[in-house]
A protein has these predicted regions:
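Cap/insert and terminal regions of metallo-dependent hydrolase folds
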Residues: 2-18, 217-218, 224-229, 235-339
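Binuclear metal-dependent hydrolase catalytic cores
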Residues: 2-229, 316-350, 356-361
């Protein structure tokens, strides 16, 4: 017993000595940890680890409502060696970097519509595309007609900053010809149109119903026998169900009206009439989780991934309340999306692989 007590006292003394040493040398330890962490992060390129196939990463699963764990709406699609970003909400360009996916490698940005929360991360994206990739050409920005004004506005807003970057870093690092974005509008005369076909990848835009916001589209990606759809913002859409027939993955927006109604009531009770009106209005042009599930079932999708989540879901404990009875309406897996999730569809296979590139919601 005496030896046990002595051992305990010795262990406690060693712990205290260690703590005091760590405190005394915290600056040196901090510098060492920072150097080590920086070296590891700078060497990360998660694109290099992806096999040939079609991949979709969630770089923003949030909405305009504040949520520290979720950037604004954003998806990144990789097909072979091609990479396209779909929508770019606030904080999403930074999230791409944290995911170990360099925006400098983006071949283009595809916009579903021009709501502010889908474009307010465009400035950082085009800056990272230029500076991290030493790009010699602007970032192509695809979207329905009207995208020209969006791109022109951001280019004008960043024009002065571009001159600062060139003067400071030099044209070899930031070639003047690579600054900003360049609009690539397409016409949506019918329910669907091919946006581009290149090196085995086909991207199709299709109309959705986000009235009164027009134009509004979603996108289908096909590559080497694998396919996925991204809904954009929409009410439940029969056109989406038709165009996305048989996809491996459907990434669909979702708003739970019952939970938003509770936010509406709370805002009204606290004298916030404007916020209450907005909470009321947004319920009529989005899709409830159980409706998204029905669309996935009708389309025959292999997996449903919910994103652009309204209201904010700061904890996984809220997921059951958010989904309601959705799981009973779909024969496949349902995933409540979190920033940093990556889904892979290997070419020549029917499997769906999942990984996480950053830590998720608690």
């Amino acid at each position: 017993m005496v030896w046990f007590k002595r051992f305990g006292l010795l262990a406690l003394a060693l712990v205290l000595i260690g703590a005091l040493a760590a405190y005394a040398f915290q600056a040196r330890l901090g510098t060492w940890l920072f150097e080590r962490g920086t070296a590891q992060r700078m060497g990360v390129d998660n694109l290099a680890a992806l096999g040939d196939g079609l991949h979709v990463g969630l770089c923003g699963t949030g909405s305009p409502m504040p949520n520290l764990d979720r950037a604004g709406p954003c998806n990144v699609v990789i097909a072979g060696k091609q990479m396209y970003v779909v929508d770019i909400g606030e904080g999403a360009a930074e999230t791409l970097n944290v995911m170990g996916i360099s925006p400098g490698k983006a071949d283009g940005l595809l916009l579903t519509h021009f709501h502010s929360d889908h474009i307010d991360g465009f400035g950082p994206l085009m800056l990272f595309h230029w500076t991290r990739g030493s790009s010699t050409a602007p970032l192509p920005v695809y979207g329905p007609k009207g995208v020209e004004a969006i791109v022109a506005g951001f280019n004008a807003a960043y024009a002065t900053d571009n001159t600062y970057r060139i003067a400071h870093h030099g044209p070899r690092v930031v070639p003047p010809s690579g600054a900003g974005g360049i609009a690539r509008p397409f016409d949506m005369a019918g329910p669907a149109t091919t946006v581009l076909e290149h090196d085995g990848l086909k991207i199709t835009a299709f109309t959705v119903n986000h009235d009164p916001i027009k134009p509004s589209v979603g996108y289908r990606f096909d590559y080497k026998g694998r396919s996925l759809c991204i809904s954009g913002d929409t009410k439940k859409s029969s056109n989406l169900e038709a165009v996305c027939k048989g996809v491996d993955i459907l990434v669909h927006e979702a708003l739970n009206p019952a939970l938003v109604q509770k936010m509406e009531a709370a805002a009204a009770a606290n004298g916030q009439a404007g916020a209450a009106k907005i909470m009321h209005d947004i319920q009529d042009y989005h899709t409830a989780p159980w409706e998204a599930v029905e669309s996935a079932q009708t389309a025959g999708a292999g997996m449903l991934v919910l994103s652009h989540l309204v209201p904010p879901l700061p904890s996984r404990w809220l997921y059951a309340a958010f989904l309601g009875d959705a799981k009973s309406r779909f024969s496949g897996p349902i995933v409540v999306g979190e920033d940093g999730m990556m889904f892979s569809l290997p070419a020549g296979s029917k499997t769906i692989d999942r990984t996480r590139l950053i830590r998720g919601t608690g």
